[in-house]
Amino acid sequence: MASTTTCTRFTDEYQLFEELGKGAFSVVRRCMKIPTGQEYAAKIINTKKLSARDHQKLEREARICRLLKHPNIVRLHDSISEEGFHYLVFDLVTGGELFEDIVAREYYSEADASHCIQQILESVNHCHLNGIVHRDLKPENLLLASKSKGAAVKLADFGLAIEVQGDQQAWFGFAGTPGYLSPEVLRKDPYGKPVDMWACGVILYILLVGYPPFWDEDQHRLYQQIKAGAYDFPSPEWDTVTPEAKDLINKMLTINPAKRITASEALKHPWICQRSTVASMMHRQETVDCLKKFNARRKLKGAILTTMLATRNFSAAKSLLKKPDGVKESTESSNTTIEDEDVKARKQEIIKVTEQLIEAINNGDFEAYTKICDPGLTAFEPEALGNLVEGMDFHRFYFENALSKSNKPIHTIILNPHVHLVGDDAACIAYIRLTQYMDGSGMPKTMQSEETRVWHRRDGKWQNVHFHRSGSPTVPIKPPCIPNGKENFSGGTSLWQNI
């Protein structure tokens, strides 16, 4: 049974042996539990190199792996924290990658492909039943329990996996491996369990012919193919594949996630559950030959990436491997895992909450405003005559005496927002704020101010803790005195833009 231990040192219970693999800030080594002599694989994470957000991801991975107990999933047996290191103790799987095993076989048929994808679907179905979305299904994460003939396929690496409630669809960030990304992720739409089924469709396609359904050296063109669902079954290699196999692929590679087949439904598909009578038993030598080339290509790219990450500072390596928009270069597009929510999604979150705050101001909704602002909010603004304003009373005055009593339409635009993320729970946004309104004579007016807001996240909610506004104060409502019977808007207080 998996357990979290902090009181017992890993070195007291386990003996370490040779290295099995290496990541950016982790290494996997064979180990033995001293009291029992049982062998495992220990993933050793150097926690000194992790940010607070990386720590959260590590905790999430351990939590998810403890939950999943299935014959087709690599099992987590122990999770141990020490000073500077965290140890995840997994099953020792010795059979290597599924795709490497296939090319070494003397005989490989459509029925064998059906058996492979069935085991993958069993693992995915178990994940989905437990509210887990893997998000990174690909050949590198499909291992064999041993080198014995007929060894079980094991799904590995839950580093990108997320927890969802039921059939929840939400934006969990841009994460996965380019060739296996679903259309909804590429469109930045809310997503959920169906992303795993899309990846299963890509994997099944490769299992049958040895090459992927979507491929282009240019990543932009690759993504366009995926979003359009632009794949086909070309001759002659697909001529010998049964219609039932193609039907299952079509159901998996359905662009609309709501109409995409689920894991439980796929397991009931005739090509899976009636394999002996439906799937072809003909040996597919061309598939094996193509798969050898496919394996060689992804292994070369994987080796290049590993070398770069192992020989450079990790954050520097990440920046070298990424384009300005946070997406990896196309030379790594076939098998490089990417996770981009740390930048784009978090910045968008800050812009969105800033817009919500301004909407509360425009609506004169002080209650909504106070929910978004810290009670000790500080501010510099022209109306405070250079003084630092602290607390909500200064702002309450305008809400109660002007904003809530105004029924004039107001429209605000945020121009050129720039967000700086300061750690995991703080951010700063600078922007130009344009406010359009109708003056007392019915003429349209526009006010401009330059604003900076500092946000802090507490208990999962962003709160505005400070803002600084510059610009000349102007009054969008009728002042108390109108000399010569004319309205004067040259001075006074900006009742919409002072908060």
UniProtKB/Swiss-Prot annotation:
Its activity is regulated as follows:
Activated by Ca(2+)/calmodulin. Binding of calmodulin results in conformational change that relieves intrasteric autoinhibition and allows autophosphorylation of Thr-287 which turns the kinase in a constitutively active form and confers to the kinase a Ca(2+)-independent activity.
Keyword terms: Acetylation, ATP-binding, Calmodulin-binding, Cell membrane, Kinase, Membrane, Nucleotide-binding, Phosphoprotein, Sarcoplasmic reticulum, Serine/threonine-protein kinase, Transferase
At which positions is ATP bound?
Answer: 20-28, 43
Q: What Pfam family does this protein match (any one)?
A: Pkinase
| Domain (Protein kinase): residue spans on this chain | 14-272
Catalysed reaction(s) here are: L-seryl-[protein] + ATP = O-phospho-L-seryl-[protein] + ADP + H(+); L-threonyl-[protein] + ATP = O-phospho-L-threonyl-[protein] + ADP + H(+)
Post-translational modification (record): Autophosphorylation of Thr-287 following activation by Ca(2+)/calmodulin. Phosphorylation of Thr-287 locks the kinase into an activated state.
Please state where this protein is localized. Answer: Cell membrane, Sarcolemma; Sarcoplasmic reticulum membrane
Query: Is Kinase among this UniProt entry's keywords?
Result: yes
**Modification type N6-acetyllysine: residues:** 318
The catalytic residues are 136
Give GO terms for biological process. Answer: cardiac muscle cell contraction; cellular response to calcium ion; endoplasmic reticulum calcium ion homeostasis; long-term synaptic potentiation; negative regulation of sodium ion transmembrane transport; positive regulation of cardiac muscle cell apoptotic process; positive regulation of cardiac muscle hypertrophy; protein phosphorylation
Modification sites for Phosphoserine: 315, 319, 330, 333, 404, 490, 494
Q: What class of enzyme is it?
A: transferase
| E.C. no | 2.7.11.17
Read off the domain note. The CAMK2 protein kinases contain a unique C-terminal subunit association domain responsible for oligomerization.
The similarity annotation says:
Belongs to the protein kinase superfamily. CAMK Ser/Thr protein kinase family. CaMK subfamily.
Query: What is the name listed in the Swiss-Prot or TrEMBL entry for this protein?
Result: Calcium/calmodulin-dependent protein kinase type II subunit delta
What is the species listed in this Swiss-Prot or TrEMBL entry? Homo sapiens
Taxonomic lineage is: Eukaryota, Metazoa, Chordata, Craniata, Vertebrata
